[in-house]
Swiss-Prot record:
Source lineage: Eukaryota, Fungi, Dikarya, Ascomycota, Saccharomycotina
Superkingdom, natural source: Eukaryota
Gene: AIM4
Cytoplasm recorded as keyword: yes
Gene Ontology cellular component annotations, sorted alphabetically: cytoplasm
Segments for region (Disordered): 1-38
Organism of provenance: Vanderwaltozyma polyspora (strain ATCC 22028 / DSM 70294 / BCRC 21397 / CBS 2163 / NBRC 10782 / NRRL Y-8283 / UCD 57-17) (Kluyveromyces polysporus)
Protein's name in the database: Altered inheritance of mitochondria protein 4
Record's subcellular location: Cytoplasm
Amino acid sequence: MNYINMKKIDEENKANSGDDTTESRKKQKTKNNEEHEIRSDELFRKSIFFDSHWNPNGVAPPNHRNVFYNPKTFVHRGKPIIAKLMDLDEEHLTKLISKTQK
């Protein structure tokens, strides 16, 4: 895919995305069977963009799709990883660190 095709695709995506909030809203029933609207681009704590300080609603940046955070994705599967630092043990590392801090 060349640059021109990619640019056309980007322009089409921008034209299709728009700022129409009615398309990005869904109705969801709560425990009390009350309907309320939520924006599909706001996933709150479930969003990969969620941060309690700078993005508490978990809103995706412009031109990015918001997806659910899956904690299983970031779990190491397999044998445990043992850190090897050029065959240095803790004693040798502390000596090297103390020499560099002088």
